[in-house]
Amino acid sequence: MKMEQACRFRTDEAGYMVCARSQGLTADNENNLGYFNSTMTSLFEKDGSGPRMGQSILSYAVSEENGGRRDFLIAKSTMRSDIKGRASIFTHAYFMGLDEYARCMETDPSAIYGIDTGDMMTAQSGSQLPPKETVLRGGFELSVLREKYGLTDERYALLLYNVYQAVAGGGSLALLTQLPLSQTQDMVREVAYCAAMGMLPGLRWRLTCSSAADTRAAICVSSKAGGGGMGIPLCTFDLDDGGRRLEEDPFVAELFRYLASAAPEERRQMLLDMQYILGELVPLEYASLEMIATAYHMRKMNDGNRPENDVYDRVVGNLLLCGRVPSANQETVNKLLIWMLKRQNAALPKRIMELSVDRCVKQAQADAAGGRELCDCVCRLLQYSRSAEQL
């Protein structure tokens, strides 16, 4: 696989510009390098004493929407001085189309995280670069990396919960570590690989990462050894503290404990099945953490497992709420609700009515229009399911 590459630096008063490129570099590629203008923030000391000259940050990033082609970029950004002695960022980047990147992440994340970055430059004197021939580093085995970072089943479940929380919530997970920034590059991509193997395949492309505290990435690093930060992370995961446990609501926690402890093939199939269920309801980009957990419980029900009353009600309630998303497949949502109500109605008719209507009444109190609509919907579905059984 070949990737275009370029180097960018501030060489004169005109500001940052591409100073070396491969022949196939496009104007869109060049514009997308602007993403790294602000990475220098993480290469200043936290106490404001100055820049960390010669230190580098490794980023796995998706360019922002700017009206042109979006790229996936692997970039090394290094703090240097320009011709006027000002602190400036030298960036060497590899480019891949967003669609190709998403396909690689969906089928095998090691095809991305395993790309060798050992020869990425921190300075460049020439102006011409050949296309980058990708060479995989190897060594990306989940069991090996979990042992390396102490990711027991309980710790791995907590990591996955935090990563899903960041990706679904549009925020960032900060990995807390005692390591200095000079030693976090391998760590962040290896932990990101562990996270990717527990992610829904269609969401993996959003698993960007940075070896510094750049909260634009889904996973970033907050080093206790120094280095500035960009923004406030949504959540944190302390790599040096093995005592924390997943103490979330059982409805959600059960999913991540399953993903952490399942055999590789079982985990892979569960993720594919969950993704299929979600895709029938809403586009993946609208999938909240709650809906992802709902897909897991629906998958279990499809195997013939009878859920507890509270789990059943939660799934019904979430499907009702899902129907309010503008892009939801309302017909599929209603069919699933009817299927669930018919499936359980014979055993728990009063319980279902009490729990489901009570949930909708609470919604009505919080949001009059939407809540009444939900309440009407669940009552119609219950009436339909009962009349269908009498036929």
Model-derived features: where do they sit?
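Extended amphipathic alpha-helical coiled-coil/heptad-repeat regions
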Residues: 320-391
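N-terminal module detector in large eukaryotic regulators
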Residues: 1-351
